[in-house]
Amino acid sequence: MSAALFSLDGPARGAPWTAEPAAFYEPGRAGKPGRGAEPAASAMYDDESAIDFSAYIDSMAAVPTLELCHDELFADLFNSNHKAGALELLPGGPARLGGPGPAPRPLKREPDWGDGDAPGSLLPAQVAACAQTVVSLAAAAQPTPPASPEPPRRSPAPPAPGPARDKAAGKRGPDRGSPEYRQRRERNNIAVRKSRDKAKRRNQEMQQKLVELSAENEKLQQRVEQLTRDLAGLRRFFKQLPGAPFLPGAGAADAR
């Protein structure tokens, strides 16, 4: 019994470990450590095959993130009936439950992922498609800088409706061929002529007034020149006269 347990658990002490998978889910080992191995254990281990996850680990390491592809990535890997598999893996099969039952089905052999013709070869293609999708989404999420700043376009504001605009919209003039329109045109022409004539008369009056003021200015300048000459003659006259004999106040003061 001890020799059988030692041979199932692994090699002898000091020997290198092999790459064969360990029996982690053997029901007889976990509950009763002292119970011997059953004859069905060898057949169960013969049907088992190891799965190499190195290809998937490398592909997952190359992809930035596979959050969007987790369901698709592991859907085919673990898509099996675990309840039926557990019943088949138990030593004795359905016969242990008691009573005659259906014949035990053969164990499902895991497909070889390295074989290109097997149905499981679709999983690497799914991983590659998920990687391309994630890379494209990451590239699309990066913000692109604007090419050139464009000036903001301002939409023309609609004119505010006012009382004058409402009156102009509500009041429409007569037709151009009607006599009322002609009469209004004649009145407008007469008013324009009168305003023009009035402006001309004002211009002529201002020109005439300018001429008169210019003539008066010349006369005033001549008057100023005449007064300046008279003042100069009077100064010369008073400078030539003696000052003492002609002062009556000075003579009266001396007599006293």
UniProtKB/Swiss-Prot annotation:
Residues 178-241 form the bZIP domain. PROSITE patterns: BZIP. It is found in: Nucleus. The gene is CEBPD. Residues 143-162 have a biased composition (Pro residues). It comes from the Eukaryota. Residues 18-40, 92-121, 139-206 are annotated as: Disordered. Pfam families: bZIP_2 (PF07716). The modification N-acetylserine is found at S2. There is a cross-link at K108 (Glycyl lysine isopeptide (Lys-Gly) (interchain with G-Cter in SUMO)). Binds DNA as a homodimer and as a heterodimer. Can form stable heterodimers with CEBPB. Can form stable heterodimers with CEBPA and CEBPE. Directly interacts with SPI1/PU.1; this interaction does not affect DNA-binding properties of each partner. Interacts with PRDM16. Keywords: Acetylation, Activator, DNA-binding, Isopeptide bond, Nucleus, Transcription, Transcription regulation, Ubl conjugation. Transcription activator that recognizes two different DNA motifs: the CCAAT homology common to many promoters and the enhanced core homology common to many enhancers. Important transcription factor regulating the expression of genes involved in immune and inflammatory responses. Transcriptional activator that enhances IL6 transcription alone and as heterodimer with CEBPB. Residues 182-209 are annotated as: Basic motif. Belongs to the bZIP family. C/EBP subfamily. Residues 164-188 have a biased composition (Basic and acidic residues). GO terms for molecular function: DNA-binding transcription factor activity, RNA polymerase II-specific; RNA polymerase II cis-regulatory region sequence-specific DNA binding. GO terms for cellular component: nucleus. GO terms for biological process: DNA-templated transcription; regulation of cell differentiation; regulation of transcription by RNA polymerase II. The keyword Transcription regulation applies. It comes from Bos taurus. Residues 213-241 are annotated as: Leucine-zipper. This is CCAAT/enhancer-binding protein delta.
